Amino acid sequence: GLNVNRPIEDDELDRLVAAADLDELVRLVDTRTSGRDWEGLFRLRERTRAAVQTGRQLWPAATLAEHRLALYGESSWACRVLDEESGRFAIGPLTEVVAQNHAWIDLAPHLPHGPRRSFVAYERALRGDVVGDEVDEVLDIPVPPQDWEPSYPMAEYNDFGVECPSPLDTARLEWHDIDDESDFEPIDDPWVDRALRSLVEPWTSSSNGRAESVVVAGSASDALHALGIRRGRLAAIDPGLAMAWLAWCGASGGAHGRRRGAATGRFEAWWMIAAIGGLTDDWDEFRECGELADEIGSVLVNTQWWCFDDGDRSSAYRLSLVASLADDDPENESATPLGVALLARDHPSIV
């Protein structure tokens, strides 16, 4: 292996760093990527990152070099950019970038034990890879997807960016108008509110977004009325699509925030389901006795899910979801169902 502490002569790189020539450094990143010069690309990353100590702001070149190494580099080189200082200005977690084009069997020997190894394992498992049992469950949920989980939307990173369309973009929906009349009892549920805010946190903290939830004793239409939506449409969707939509939201950075990655999105979706099903207080107990996955899956598949349309076309990032849960008391035949409406929006700034 390369001793990265020993100075290597690289006259072209050193000249560009000394001149703080960002444009030419980006071209050099392109050249070394296309030539598969991973050693040279890693050296570029190291020296542009160190340039800040002499007052040169070359972090865009360092960030681009990290991105290319993680995306295209041989596994040994790709894993070198997963240190604690990397990815600070990246468009998404480098653990997700690395997982896109590298198999776990090739990555595992080069990943030291710790959270980043675990995050890569989660990401690879979501892509259908078989990951061994030696990985810590740092996200509090099983590494391999469960039988009841859907195929989650995976990001596609490219040379400069990332694409990850919402699973709702291609869904075929049958709409019907919401009821004109409403009769509901509002329920204060701080767990649902906090779970939604956690789910779309980058949309609201790093961007222009908003998030709002309501819980009512009432129907799906009642829940929308409680949100202040008097005219709108509902379409039934299957539990898998609802789960995939939640996970997509949790993975996304919204219009201007930093993407958090599919592994985090999946955890946020589990936590949102737990909040809707009233399982948050018992999460740790269920996890310790190995019942958490079954409990979350049971809430998901036994809930009626709806997408709603409130006429808002301005938001590129949206969650418009209603959950309708039956009362779980078998003795209560006349129980009113529980309606949970989740609304989140984010959109690019209009200059």
Regions found by a protein language model. Give the residues of each.
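Generic detector of well-ordered alpha-helical segments enriched in charged/polar residues
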Residues: 14, 26, 30, 193, ...
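Detector for Asparagine
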Residues: 3-5, 101, 158, 208, ...
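C-terminal, beta-strand-rich globular interaction domains
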Residues: 229-351
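Charged, amphipathic alpha-helical stretches
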Residues: 1-68
